[in-house]
């Protein structure tokens, strides 16, 4: 079977890579990205769209078997690979280090993220001059959804609801701005960027949960993405207004989102974090993607 590399064409390849990620999740969960992360990245206004054409795709006679790409900018690179093609690892790493370098705090070069369970990939990375940087690793935790779902608790006067009940982009913008520790009120000229994030093709308003304060403001938010073709779901993002933390509101939003996914058949929820916030509600660390750094050759 022949193998060939070509460059990414967004109009042609965006949906094809979504399907590829869906297929390899079913074959080998969750070593590669889940499809919603690809979709969320492309809905985010911070993504560098000028250099998408530098993404590389490998294909066999039946379609895509590997992709090298960034999430938001050059220099922070991810590799998605069909487990049937381990022989492509060296070529894909070499491509990343040669063609996808960026200007970062560490200097000019690139980080490539590799699942720690893939020790062979790590050996190849080291042989090519990459160095592991644990301080930049990406943890992954999962929540195995129990048959008897835990009771969800809320303080008096607060409620949870979905964005299908009320879709107020300005309220979402405010809780996300404050929830990610930005002081004051959010810039009004960023509301349309927020709307774009909430308009991805597979975004589900009915699974995305907010906690509503007595004054009607959203004070906690949990985004939820079903993983196509599976019984998994992915949490992204979660934020709580700092004035309303340690009240159980974030936990209530996350659990209500998971509960709704479970009602549709989900059996596991994933989140890209190992924070105590998630572990305290029953998540367990299930994997880590190590960041491997290589400075650009002069």
Model-derived regions: residue spans:
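Short amphipathic alpha-helix that is part of the acyltransferase structural core
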Residues: 1-40, 152-187, 298
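Conserved hydrophobic beta-strand within the GNAT/NAT acetyltransferase core sheet
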Residues: 110-113, 235, 268-273
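Short, high-confidence coil segments that cap the C-terminus of an alpha-helix
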Residues: 53, 105-107, 206, 266
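Conserved active-site tyrosine of GNAT-family acetyltransferases
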Residues: 123-127, 278-279, 283
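Conserved acetyl-CoA-binding loop-helix of GNAT-fold acetyltransferases
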Residues: 86-99, 240-242, 246-263, 270, ...
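Acyl-donor-binding surface of acyltransferase catalytic domains
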Residues: 64, 71-157, 289-295
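Phosphate-binding active sites in nucleotide-utilizing proteins
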Residues: 180-227, 238, 251
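Conserved donor-binding loop and adjoining core beta-sheet/short helix segment
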Residues: 10-15, 22-103, 114, 212-232, ...
